[in-house]
Regions:
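N-terminal post-signal-peptidase region of extra-cytosolic proteins
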Residues: 50-57, 68, 127-132
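The feature marks short-to-medium sequence segments in extracytoplasmic or secretory-pathway proteins
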Residues: 61, 74-140
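Surface-exposed edge beta-strand/loop patches
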Residues: 22, 35-36, 90-94, 122-181
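Short, solvent-exposed loop/turn segments enriched in Ser/Thr/Gly
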Residues: 63-68, 142
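N-terminal secretory signal peptides that target proteins for export/translocation
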Residues: 1-2
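Low-complexity, acidic Ser/Thr/Pro/Gly-rich terminal tails and inter-domain linkers that flank the onset
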Residues: 26-62
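C-terminal segment of classical bacterial N-terminal signal peptides
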Residues: 14-21
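Sec-dependent N-terminal signal peptides
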Residues: 5-14
Length: 181
């Protein structure tokens, strides 16, 4: 009799665990607030912030919104892959304004460890260009600033930034997160 009770309890526990898993799946986006640190692996730390940074020469039809991904990888450094596109369906980093996805219009990469190669140029994203992604290697601190053209009718709606990044070195790990701005 006792064996049957233990067996039933074990089956019940496994059924409950399968129906209500406790752990987050690897590709489920983590929800964070602006300013919170997101960790990828043991060496890469990312903080997302709104910014008043200007993107000179880039015209927007709606409201300009700049979001900065501040990164720190320490002396060991990191190699990171991300995919940006002016088409929100193809971009792995985009702004959610209400129910609308807004793709970035331009990007500035600022990584002091690049030395003279750190030109901080504004790269305008072309909707016709469907290039794969960007791989960058850096040490210590750096940032990626993104300009979004938010339609005027969405200027008062809550904003969230959806981000999918892959750290290639020193270990291979992908992370998705959504930041409430």
């Amino acid at each position: 009799m006792m064996r049957k009770v233990v067996l039933l309890a074990a089956i019940f526990a496994m059924t409950i665990n399968a129906a209500f898993p406790q752990s987050r799946s690897a590709d489920e986006a983590k929800q964070v607030r602006a300013g919170e640190v997101v960790r990828i692996g043991d060496t890469l730390f990312i903080r997302v912030m709104k910014s008043a940074q200007a993107f000179a020469g880039i015209k927007v039809k709606g409201e300009a919104m700049v979001v900065v991904l501040e990164m720190e990888a320490g002396k060991q450094g990191a190699t990171l892959f991300y995919k940006l596109n002016a088409n929100p369906a193809s971009s792995e980093i985009y702004l959610l304004s209400g129910a609308r996805k807004v793709a970035p219009r331009a990007v500035i990469e600022d990584f002091p460890s690049w030395g003279k190669d750190n030109d901080k140029d504004i790269d305008s994203l072309d909707p016709k260009e469907t290039v794969g992604g960007t791989t960058l290697t850096f040490q210590q601190k750096g940032s990626i600033a993104l300009l979004f053209d938010v339609p005027l009718e969405d200027s008062k709606t809550p904003k969230k930034l959806s981000v999918a990044l892959r750290m290639v070195q020193p270990m291979d790990e992908q992370r998705s997160f959504v930041v409430s701005l």
